[in-house]
Amino acid sequence: MHKSNSTYFSDMDISRTHLFTAIIRNGIRKHSRLYGAKKNAVAGAVGATEGTRGKHYIALGGISCLFKKEILPYKKYEMWTRLLCWDNKWFYLVTHLVKPGVGQPKSWALQPWKKSKPAKDVDPEKLKGAIYATAIAKYVIKRGGITVPPETALIDADMVPAKPEGWVYQEAATEEHESNGDVLPKAVDAKDWNWDVIEAERLRGLKVAEHFAAMDGMHDFFDGGKEGVLGEFADLLY
């Protein structure tokens, strides 16, 4: 016996909702009438295009999960969720279900009162060995029928700074090549996260997310049975 695979998805929904609302919380707050925003200011909430009508909502566009190890009954586990990247429409979030205690956060941005253990290098293989499952999901913000671009929403939520006028991404200035050919952003402090660093990290995650996005092409494989089928099988006897 083990934890039902179907329950992973409802658990991860909770984790992703916590993270995503935390990411855009300032955009929600600054335009909410509950926090003193005037009625005419509410119309421009969370990066919406001026003149559009309709309420904002967040929609899940798809999810894929890779199961690595079973979780035995009553076994504790942790969910670690992060924003992987974004493109012109979608936010891509990754969630790991892992053995408790394997992760040691360097800091707690929204909970500064929590104590952090001294930073130390952790064996990547040990981290991978602690993973039960990993999932990727994509979310979109809509205002009525209009898509709110992720970058616009992040700027509106004060999560990233506005791009400098005339800014162009310079790969060599922000990335370093490891001996195995991997390209990784250089380690930086939070205060150093300018658009060069942000874009380097976004593109690193997008290399994985693009494969997930390509799965939209699977819709094209439905042919309505034009070449014949094995049969029709109902789950009820009528």
What feature does the model see in each segment?
Residues 1-8:
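A conserved, well-ordered hydrophobic junction motif at loop->secondary-structure transitions
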Residues 15-18, 100:
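Short hydrophobic alpha-helical module
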Residues 17-77, 83:
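Hydrophobic beta-strand-centered segment that forms part of the acyl-chain substrate-binding groove
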Residues 71-76, 82-238:
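HotDog/MaoC-like acyl-thioester-processing domains
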